[in-house]
Amino acid sequence: MQSLQVLAIVALVVATIIAIVVWTIVFIEYRKILRQRKIDRLINRITERAEDSGNESDGDQEELSALVERGHLAPWDVDDL
């Protein structure tokens, strides 16, 4: 009976560790999805303003650049194909 209790405790600890790892991965992916939605909204806002006024919004581009942690980024201009 003693070994069965030890086995149950070990199984519970392993299950807890697996649950923590899985929920950590889920949380990281959720944050990525939220960040991508924010980037998509900024891109849409930049393109709408560019269509309306003939030029792009510098503030939105700076915010988008800060989100993707790169320099000037224009994802709609793809010349690397």
From Swiss-Prot:
Ranges annotated as biased composition (Acidic residues): 53-63
Ranges in the topological domain labelled Cytoplasmic: 29-81
Extracellular side: 1-7
Function statement: Enhances virion budding by targeting host CD4 and Tetherin/BST2 to proteasome degradation. Degradation of CD4 prevents any unwanted premature interactions between viral Env and its host receptor CD4 in the endoplasmic reticulum. Degradation of antiretroviral protein Tetherin/BST2 is important for virion budding, as BST2 tethers new viral particles to the host cell membrane. Mechanistically, Vpu bridges either CD4 or BST2 to BTRC, a substrate recognition subunit of the Skp1/Cullin/F-box protein E3 ubiquitin ligase, induces their ubiquitination and subsequent proteasomal degradation.
Keyword annotations of the record: AIDS, Apoptosis, Host membrane, Host-virus interaction, Inhibition of host innate immune response by virus, Inhibition of host tetherin by virus, Ion channel, Ion transport, Membrane, Phosphoprotein, Transmembrane, Transmembrane helix, Transport, Viral immunoevasion
Record's miscellaneous remark: HIV-1 lineages are divided in three main groups, M (for Major), O (for Outlier), and N (for New, or Non-M, Non-O). The vast majority of strains found worldwide belong to the group M. Group O seems to be endemic to and largely confined to Cameroon and neighboring countries in West Central Africa, where these viruses represent a small minority of HIV-1 strains. The group N is represented by a limited number of isolates from Cameroonian persons. The group M is further subdivided in 9 clades or subtypes (A to D, F to H, J and K).
Record bears the keyword Transmembrane: yes
Regulation: Ion channel activity is inhibited by hexamethylene amiloride in vitro.
PTM info: Phosphorylated by host CK2. This phosphorylation is necessary for interaction with human BTRC and degradation of CD4.
Tree of life domain: Viruses
Domain remark text: The N-terminus and transmembrane domains are required for self-oligomerization and proper virion budding, whereas the cytoplasmic domain is required for CD4 degradation. The cytoplasmic domain is composed of 2 amphipathic alpha helix that form a U-shape.
Family from the record: Belongs to the HIV-1 VPU protein family.
SUPFAM superfamilies linked to this entry: HIV-1 VPU cytoplasmic domain
Gene Ontology biological process terms, A to Z: receptor catabolic process; symbiont-mediated suppression of host innate immune response; symbiont-mediated suppression of host type I interferon-mediated signaling pathway; symbiont-mediated-mediated suppression of host tetherin activity; viral release from host cell
Signal peptide interval: none
Protein name: Protein Vpu
Modified residues (Phosphoserine): S53, S57
Quaternary context: Homopentamer. Interacts with host CD4 and BRTC; these interactions induce proteasomal degradation of CD4. Interacts with host BST2; this interaction leads to the degradation of host BST2. Interacts with host FBXW11. Interacts with host AP1M1; this interaction plays a role in the mistrafficking and subsequent degradation of host BST2. Interacts with host RANBP2; this interaction allows Vpu to down-regulate host BLM sumoylation.
InterPro entries attached to this UniProt entry: Vpu (IPR008187), Vpu_cyt_dom_sf (IPR009032)
Annotated region described as Disordered, given as residue ranges: 50-81
Primary location class: host cell
Topology in the lipid bilayer: Single-pass type I membrane protein
Subcellular location: Host membrane
